[in-house]
Each structure stands twice: as structure tokens, then as C-alpha cells.
């Protein structure tokens, strides 16, 4: 506002407005019109939808119908019209008088934008009625706000009766004068009302100047100037006379532009781009008429950085109206309605605050508290960080000097002063609580129990939700009966179809009267296999031994051999005489299963006689035996034929005349059972019997590696890390094992600082306890021809020397149970420990249960030169010279032990002795031959024994005398240094060493066998 305008306003007498305050004695609202206005609430009849024809819609609808010249009055009434919904309309004076506080700067920007935009819609059509447009403008107007955010002007002039008849289509309700009651002591604002009256005064002070612009521009400038004065007065409302409102520089520049003098051309064109493309199609006159309004609107839009400034300013106006109406409703409940006031006071007051203290608050106090609460809700309350650092105490200056220094440095904080100075903080706090309680109750909410939610929308679940739902439901498993325990025949000689599940097979009894029993039956596979192979035995005799190649799938075991449960020994003795050997193999092509046949006694004996003849013919000469080895289980592995230099055991019934004389009427089953047992045990070594799976040998049997000790250490460390990933996570076992707190193998011994301490394995880097480790010698740094299955993590199993299983043992046990391994829970622990004893224990004891030692093993020890059994022979030299011999006969030892476990006592003891004698003669030749003949070779031949005897004698001579200490040192170097290894690594090294020794000795025996005359076929 310029000084010239201030002087003109001082000279011009103020005009009164319709909204005049009238004081009331008790601070209550007595006027009926005011009560009607105060009873309006935000949720009454949905006020947002009740207003009719907002100002902007009226302007847009009327713009489609251009007005004729001389009809300026209806055009101006589009903006300066009387509101048709007074209950939803609030004037600017009502807003200021309700809050008793000035507007904020954001609200001032919203007022300027909304009213400038409304007047711009009328100004763009003012050139059609330029003759009487200025005369139709009202001499004073007031700003009105609707609850939806729209605005309009209100002029004090009345229409003539003739004009009212012309505007019948436009509803014009009677003028509604809002009279605001003032409280007795705090609602006086006479000085502020005079300022508003001066703003509403239209003294036409612009007419005494010279008009350099068109009449429309002057009219627009008059409206813009009055709008700026009204907004500035609202910003300066209820402030002291000596205090000026603080506005930003941008808003101050806008006020200067809106109130600029008519002769100031620079201010008119300020910020206007002459080359703007918006006015390229308009005339120069229309462009100059509204450029001030467009500049004002553009400035307001640039002030807000949002994409839609119109929505923002509309929301500000809507919030201003809503807060005013809510405050009036709240004051009406507190000051007029005792029931509502008591309810709010009881909901918010504390024990120290009374109803009388809250009732003492005046209108201005409640309005100020309302503004504070709304400001906190909009801006939020942030807690300041408390500074706990205490400043050092000042002793050099006196308190007076410290105070004066703070005043000079302006180190002080201004305290907030109460309005009346007597409102305690607790009352202020309770007043805020009352206001918040009122805000929460608007609109009233229903109880959660009374609410009824509609049906949920049926939406199609996403693929992820479907997957999670299927995981939650789980898969229903079918009810299956537990599998029956397999018989001994199924364990030792399973069906030909090894890939299918093990099926129950019928045992053919010699008692032919019970041959067709209902409880015994054949399955289709066994019947078809018997028929298909019976016809091929005469033409293909090598098929007789091929059946032994098909064994049940089982993981390889380091020490090999099928185990027999102790509780099944009685069943073995009962069914041994009832079982016939199945020497046939499943043909290459399956035939459809025929009907179940019925055998006669002649057909029964003829069938097995043919099988025995084929077996005898196939084992009479060396070429036949080589052909047999290629088609049996030995042929499934390329290196397995090198481990057996002796011919397989012949049928017992064809080799023992004494036994056949004693039992001339033995049944075919009893005659062939020992040969079947011998061929299934003695022909397979302890390591080979653990690889009975044909597919395993086809895939991994030929794989051998040449690795060093460092590579084995690396492989074992990788396998250790893999086993760590398989440990359970929920019981902290994995964490303890990783941090080396618990033994890796037994998972029972816990290490501590005071003991026991863990020992780290040199190969796999595991930390084990004293029970799970041992010290052994590793004689070589490089191992050749190491089978791949020994270092494979899926095939390697932990040794049984440890009484407690390792983590890998649990995984292998689960694997064996799923693949049908015979090592199930039926085997007693004592039998497993005896069968899985370490190599040194098996060599010293070489027995299982009560069975005697193998005659083959005893004979080899007695007949081998260089082995001393007397007291003068040293144990170390005997062990050194007999190590190779015992390694060669390890297979025969396990075979005899296995047969002894099946028939430990009774009549079977004599049969076992006869079986061992027959096996020895079949491998050594007839008894009539001399001991040193080529046919009689317990190991390989004469030359081998002679070389070993010479080496043993030379070694004994060299060991005597002064060279004994040096010899012992050399022996220690050859045997290797003792290292600490766990039980798993010990079994691995033992198996690698024995496999390498077996490979070396079998290759040597095969070479000697080719150069030696074999007289076994000519012996009869």
C-alpha cells in the first residue's frame, strides 16, 4: 500500500459493512441466525454435496453464452452474486472474528489465487459490454468461501425490481447478514473492524487521475487493488498498532504490483513476456485487458512447486472453512450446551483440573488453543534433543557480571507469555485434550462390534500365493503297509530285476505234496525268468553264472560283504535245504508272464541237472573259466578279474567222494546249496562283495585315479565342508561343530579350556575327541590306481571302528534304508562290530563267532617260507614277510568266516569242513600231487615262494649284528611317519592301501599264471 493510497483512505469516510459485531452480556450466542450457522457441522447432510452452482461452474456455463452489449449486470453477477446456500458459506470476516488471529501466508496466497481466477473468468468477456461494465461494478464487496473450496464475491448493492424480473432464471435469495456475537472481555476488535471497513469502502479514488488506459483496464485494476487491500488487512488482523505483519519478499512484490498506480506503466508490464504465444491469436485490446490478472495467477502458480496448484489452493480454502465451522460447533457445545461440555471435560480433564477452571476460559483463549492444536496436528511435534553436557561453572565473574555479559551477547530466550497471565499449564494441557477429544468425535465412529464388513472381493491369487498355499497344505501321503523283512535268499541272491523293488519269492520245497500251497507263491518276474532261461542253458552255458551279477542296490561298504542278522540264523538253517540256486540271469528281452506252471519231480531234477552240467563244462578248462569271468560279476569290473587268479569253486557234489558216500540220498537242494554258497562267497572278496550293484560297477568300476597325499587332504577337506552343510540348524549342532566345540564324528564330546581338548585330523582337518582318532603310518606320498569310489562323497561310508556314528554316517544310513540295503536295524551291534573290525584285528582273529579259523589261511601261513612261528622269530619280521600273504588270502578268510556265521554248529560243522577241503583242493590241485608242483600253488607258484623265502632269509641275516639299528630306522622310513587321523580317514587310507596292494599282486599273479602249466582240467 502506497503513501498516496493511505492518505486517500484517511480522507475518505469509512462505510459500514453488513457483518457488524454486537456485544452480548454473557458470551453466549443468542441470535437465531447465528445459532443456525453454529449448528452446522461437517457431517450434516453431506455439506460437500449440497452446494449449488459454484462460482467457477457458473462462470464456465455462462461463458458458452456470450452476453450482448449493455448487459454487464448479469455478467458481473456471475462473480458478484449472492450465495444460494448460506449454511455452507462463510465470509472472510467470520473467519477472522472466529479465530481472533490473522491469516497465514499460505492462506493469503490461496485467497489471491482463487479470487483472481474467479474474476479473470468474468474479465475475459468484459469487452462485450464495455459501455456499462464499470458502472455495474459494486462499490464494495466481501469475500465468501464455500466448504468445497470455491469462492465468490458479495456486493452490498441491491437490484432494482425491473432487473430482478429480468434475472428470474438466476436464483437470488435475500441478503443474509451475518451478525457475530462478541464475548464480554476478549472478543473486542473495533480497531480491526475499522480496517476491514476501509477495505470495503469504494471511494472511487482512482477517478480523479488522468486515464491513460482503456476503461476496462481501469475497472480491472480497481478490483485487483481492493482484493490486495482485503488480503493484506486479513494478514494484519488483530495485531498491535505498532506491529507490522511479516510477509515474504515474493508476496510483498505481488502486493506492490496489485496496488500500483495507474500512471505507473512499468508496474503494469512487470514480468509480462511480450512474445508470449498465448496471445498470438488474440487482439491487442483483449491482451491488454487481462494481462494483470494473468500475471497474478501465474505468480501464484509459480509459488507452489506442485504439478496442480489449483488443487492445492482449493484445499487450503476448504480447510479454512472447515476449521471455522468446527470451531463454532465446539464453542457452542462448551459455552452453550452444558451436557456436551461436561462430557468433553470429563473425557479430558485431569484430577487437578476442575470444570470451573475450564469454564473461566474465554472465547479468545479457546480460539488460540484451537489454532495451536491444529498447527501441531498439521506440522507435527518434534522432540528436541536434550543436551546432557554441563557447562563448566564460572568462578572468575560474579553472577551480576555473568548476567550482564549474557545481556550484551543476547544470550537469552524469550518465554511465551499467557494471554491473561493467569492460565496455568495444566489448564492449557487439559484444554488441548478437550479439543483433541472433540476432533476425534467428528464424525462419530461406530463400535467395531457393530460394524459389518461386506463380502471380500474374489480376486484370483497370484502364482506365488498359489505356491505358498500348496506348501502350507502339504501333500497327503498314501497309506502303505510297512515292507516285510527280506529273506536270506533275497539278501544273498536277489531276483534278476535289480532295478525294481524287491518282491517276495516262493521257495520251492522238496516236499512235493505241499508244492501247491496257497501261502507260497511265485511272482510274475521270477516265473518268466525261470522259463526264459531254462531253454537257453544248453546253448549258452555261460548264462548260468551271470545271475550272480544282479544284486540289490546298496552303497559300497569299505570292508564289504553282506551281513546276516543273528536272529535270521535259525531261518537260514531251516531254509538252507529248501533253496535251489538260481544260476540264470534275466534275458535281454522280457517276455510276457505266462500262467503259473506245475512241475513234476522228473522235470524238477532234469532242470537242475542241466544247470549243473553247464556249470561243470564251463569250469573245466582255462579258456572256459576266462569266458565265465567275462560274463559274471567279475566281468562287470575291469580290474576284478585280476584279483582272482584261482578258478572258482566247483560244485561240492562233484568233488567229494567221501561225503557223497555218507549221504547218497541227498536232495538236489542239499547237494547244490554248498556250492552255491561257496561260489557266492569265496569267489567274491570282502571289497568286491560290497559292490554287488551292476549299475554301480558299470558306472564307477573302471574309474581309477593317481592322486597324491596332498590331493587326498584337499578332497577330504572339501567333503568335510559339504558334511557341515548337512548338519541340523535348529539345535546349534552346526555352530558348535564349525567352531570346533564338539567332536565332529560322535557329536557328543564337548571341548573346553580345561579339557578335554580336541585333536585335529591331518587329512580332513576335523576336530575329533580322543575316542574318534588314531595314529597310523602313511607309507607313501603318492597312490596309483586309487578307485574313484573311495574318494566319492556319495559312495564313501565311515568306518565302524568308532562306537558313535559321524554326521556322514547318518546320511548314508538314510540312503541305505531307501535303496533297500541289507544293513538294517535287524543286525545286532556285536555282529556289526565283528564284521567291521579293522584290518589288523581281522588278520589276528580271522573268525566270526565260534567258527574256527579258515584252513586256507592256516595252510598258507604254514606253507609259506620265511614265516617263523617259534619263539625266536621276531614279530616285526614275521609281520613284514607275511603281510603280502595275508593280503592275498583276505578274500578267502572273509568267505570262510561268512560261511561259518551261517552254520556255526551241529551237523553243519562237518559240512563246513568238507566245503573248505573241497575249496582248497579245487584251488590247489589233487592231493596226490607234490607240494611244490605247478598245480599246487597256494599263492601263485614255486618261483614266487622261492623269491620270498630268499628275501626273508637275507633280511634275517641283514637284521642281525651291528646293522640292526640302521635297519630299524630304514624300516621306520619305509613305513612312514605316524600322523593323527580320524577314524573316517583311517578307513579311507586302509582301503586305498589294500586296493593298491590287491591291484599289484593280482597283476603279478596273472602274469605268472600265463607262464605256468595248469593241470587242473586234466585232473578228474
Curated annotation (Swiss-Prot):
PANTHER family: PROTEIN SPIRE, SPIRE. Interacts with bsk, Rho1, Rac1, Cdc42 and wash. Interacts with capu. Acts as an actin nucleation factor, remains associated with the slow-growing pointed end of the new filament. Promotes dissociation of capu from the barbed end of actin filaments. Involved in intracellular vesicle transport along actin fibers, providing a novel link between actin cytoskeleton dynamics and intracellular transport. Required for localization of determinants within the developing oocyte to the posterior pole and to the dorsal anterior corner. Links Rho family signaling and Jnk function to the actin cytoskeleton. Residues 705-725 are annotated as: Spir-box. Residues 1-50, 176-215, 582-601, 637-688, 799-824, 837-884, 895-914, 920-941 are annotated as: Disordered. The keyword Manganese does not apply. Residues 90-327 form the KIND domain. Phosphorylated by Jnk kinase (bsk). Binds to actin monomers via the WH2 domain. The Spir-box targets binding to intracellular membrane structures. It is found in: Cytoplasm, Cytoskeleton; Cytoplasm, Perinuclear region; Cell membrane; Cytoplasmic vesicle membrane. Pfam families: KIND (PF16474). Its main location: cytoplasm. Changing residue 232 to K: Abolishes interaction with capu. This is Protein spire. Residues 651-676 have a biased composition (Basic and acidic residues). Keywords: Actin-binding, Cell membrane, Cytoplasm, Cytoplasmic vesicle, Cytoskeleton, Developmental protein, Membrane, Phosphoprotein, Protein transport, Repeat, Transport. Disruption phenotype: Flies display premature microtubule-dependent cytoplasmic streaming; failure in the orientation of microtubule plus ends towards the posterior pole. InterPro entries: KIND_dom, Spire, WH2_dom, Znf_FYVE_PHD, Znf_RING/FYVE/PHD. It is a peripheral membrane protein. Belongs to the spire family. Residues 399-417, 463-480 form the WH2 domain. It comes from Drosophila melanogaster. One of its GO terms (cellular component) is cytoskeleton. One of its GO terms (molecular function) is actin binding. GO terms for biological process: actin cytoskeleton organization; actin filament network formation; actin filament organization; actin filament-based process; actin nucleation; chorion-containing eggshell formation; cleavage furrow formation; establishment of meiotic spindle localization. Residues 846-866 have a biased composition (Polar residues).
